[in-house]
């Protein structure tokens, strides 16, 4: 009883100053909602129409159930997957972790939707939603990014850290909130996707909050006690291929030929080709190499510090051990679906020929590069929290480069980022990763402090100037004569 009270009190104390903490700024790392008549807007419209057709089906019934707006309403939906009840009085430590994430998530969503003014689909088309009794209540709210997919995915990522033994089922449940928001008419598909990415950004920011790791540890202990499950929070270093989240289970199938998303993929492929001779096209080729050193180069430019094995050994080791997991976690779906890559499907050249032969017979969906870059941006965001928005923006650009070069369809890239989010979450169930992250954070803090100390030191040109009598001048001398600047005599004529 006392521990429960302490956890509740600690959670609220941690959140008392939460408004003063920065929330992820979606305007920095996400594109704006699609403009009318754009390819993505047309895709959104088709999917809205298709969603309406599903409202009388079993999937429509599920969508209606999924349209919830509070943590207490989300929890029964996850309880069906977890096999335990989560509330303030049952599995209370898990509930407090989610409650803390929910309060911060609500702030982040509020800040995000205030940046946009996109009408909800049912408002735009002047039609009733699947839940007409809620239409008036939510009609003035922006639909971008989608509330349900953001919080639903955030809860799924948090629970994947708590319950790694059932992570695939949890992630599958979390992903389903996006399509439900589309079917209900409350969100467009692009709103739902933006919500997923915001949810992953929120998780990364939560891991920088003081006391959050304690809440997570208590929640993990709660789950193990209640279920007797053998969790992954042990001393085995990181993950084997078999232990990674299974992308076949929690991702939707790649778009079928002739579908709205496939048509959108074709349009984005043509758009990508038109960008190959631009700066974006050049950068896409620079980003092709999937390696520790290339990721360090890319994110060093964002952070403004050099990241390599000599200057930052702890961060370098973190990158070298994490980045392979981003690509590895996509291989299950790649092998299962064996979707043809764009240059193979279209029988055309890419903008980077050396990799064509080696990748021709490999699956395109989802993108390993997009997964790895988003994963590394989330990891770097935990190391350097003040740079999160810029890091995620760079990762988003990295993923788009795969469309420009012709190695991936847009939907490959989109869902690759979700894979990276899932891997980032479950990494926090590994003690060695958590320890390595702590070393990397401390190393970055020391390096950042040293850099700023050097920058703040007066340079020789800024040395104080004195008269020969020892009087320090508050401004450069205007009279002729001999003065002392630093350790040198200067003659003002």
Question: Which residues make up each language-model segment?
Answer:
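Sec/Tat signal peptide C-region and signal peptidase I cleavage site
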Residues: 15-20
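Short acidic/histidine-rich active-site segments
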Residues: 187-194, 406-417
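Catalytic phosphate/nucleotide-handling subdomain of diverse soluble enzymes
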Residues: 200-202, 421
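C-terminal tail/sorting-segment detector
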Residues: 482-493
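Hydrophobic alpha-helical bundle signature of multipass membrane enzymes
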Residues: 21-184, 205-215, 221-405, 418, ...
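Short, glycine-anchored, charge-dense loop/turn motifs used at functional sites
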Residues: 333, 468-471
